[in-house]
Every structure is written in C-alpha cells, then in structure tokens.
Amino acid sequence: MPQLSRYSDEQVEQLLGEMLNVLEKHKAPTDLSLMVLGNMVTNLINTSIAPAQRQAIANSFARALQSSINDDPAH
C-alpha cells in the first residue's frame, strides 16, 4: 500500500534531482554517495528528532528503505 505524504511528488522530485546533481558534480562513486547519504540521515535524526524517538524513526526508515529496494538484477 503506498504511503501518503504531506509533500507533493514535485517537491520530492525537485529535491532528489538537486541532491543527485551534487553527487554527480563531485563524481561520487556509489559507495561514497551511500556513505554521505547515510551520514546525512544520521545527522538529521540526531539533530532533529527527540532522543526517545530516534531508534523508532531509524527502524522505520530502515524498513522503508528495505521495502523500496528493487530485486531486479538489472542495474
């Protein structure tokens, strides 16, 4: 079942495009890109979420990430 969001697809796609442009500008390989994005998520959780909620948010994020991964072997 798709998740409802308070953000429009346009808002999400615009921000995603800008972030991808930064990674491409720096010619960041996949492993570096994942490291940077992971550090960004960690920083957002640690600085924007109440300590009592951090673990639950991290678990929810991890589950959402895992459920969005495509098992198609093609890149």
Curated annotation (Swiss-Prot):
It comes from Escherichia fergusonii (strain ATCC 35469 / DSM 13698 / CCUG 18766 / IAM 14443 / JCM 21226 / LMG 7866 / NBRC 102419 / NCTC 12128 / CDC 0568-73). Pfam families: DUF1414. Belongs to the UPF0352 family. This is UPF0352 protein YejL. The gene is yejL. Transmembrane segments: none annotated. It comes from the Bacteria.
